[in-house]
Amino acid sequence: MPKGCLVITVSGLAGSGTTTLCRNLAKHYGFKHIYAGLIFRQMAKEMGMTLEEFQKYVELHPEIDREIDRRQIEAAKECNVVIEGRLAGWMVKNADLKIWLDAPIMERAKRVAKREGISVEEAFVKIAEREKQNRKRYLNLYGIDIEDKSIYDLIINTAHWGPDGVFAIVKAAIDHLSPSGDAGEDEKEKEVG
C-alpha cells in the first residue's frame, strides 16, 4: 500500500456490493469506514419513516442531502478513510482512488431481496423506483448525472466476481497506486532519469 494519507471513495447502486467491499477494506487496511447510506437510514429511523417514505421526504428537503454530503467531504480530510456513498466520488474531489461498483439490476435485486427478506420482484421494483428518484434528485440538486462514470478510476461489474474477487481487484489497485496520482508521469521520469 502506498505510504501516507489515503482517501478512497466507493460508489454504486443498491445491491452492487459497496458495503461489503468497504467493510473488507476497512478490516484489511485499518481504514475508517464512512457510510452515507447508514446516515440516511438512521435519519429515516429517527423520523419514524420507512426508507421509501424518507426518500420522498428528502426530495422536498434538500438540506438532508447537503448534510450527508457535507459529512462525507469533512471525512475526506482525515487520513486512511474509505467513504461509501452514491455521490462520494463526486463529492470528494481529491480522493486518491474513486471506485464504482456495478451489476445488472436483476443481480442487484436478488442480493437486495436476500438481504431484506423480500421477493426478487419487490426488490426490483423498489430499486428501479429509488434509482429513478435519486437520479432526478441528484440532477436537480447538484447537476450530477449518476450514470456518468467518467470520474471513476476503477469500475467493476460485481456480477463477475464474488466479494473476495472484488476485494482482490481493489486491493491490487490500492497496493499499486502511484503516490503522485499519475502513473504515466512516474514512468516518464524513470525512463528519462
Swiss-Prot record:
UniProt keywords, alphabetically: ATP-binding, Cytoplasm, Kinase, Nucleotide-binding, Transferase
GO biological process entries: pyrimidine nucleotide metabolic process
List of residues binding ATP: G12, L13, A14, G15, S16, G17, T18, T19, T20
Subcellular location: Cytoplasm
Catalysed transformations (reactions): CMP + ATP = CDP + ADP; dCMP + ATP = dCDP + ADP
Gene3D superfamilies with a match to the protein in the record: P-loop containing nucleotide triphosphate hydrolases
Entry-linked InterPro entries: Cyt_kin_arch, Cytidylate_kinase_dom, P-loop_NTPase
EC number(s) reported in the record: 2.7.4.25
Name of the top EC class for this enzyme: transferase
One GO cellular component, as annotated: cytoplasm
One Pfam match: Cytidylate_kin2
Predominant subcellular localization, coarse grouping: cytoplasm
CDD domains: CMPK
GO function terms (MF aspect): ATP binding; CMP kinase activity; dCMP kinase activity
Family: Belongs to the cytidylate kinase family. Type 2 subfamily.
HAMAP family, A to Z: Cytidyl_kinase_type2
Protein name according to UniProt: Cytidylate kinase
Species of provenance: Thermococcus kodakarensis (strain ATCC BAA-918 / JCM 12380 / KOD1) (Pyrococcus kodakaraensis (strain KOD1))
Gene from which this protein is expressed: cmk
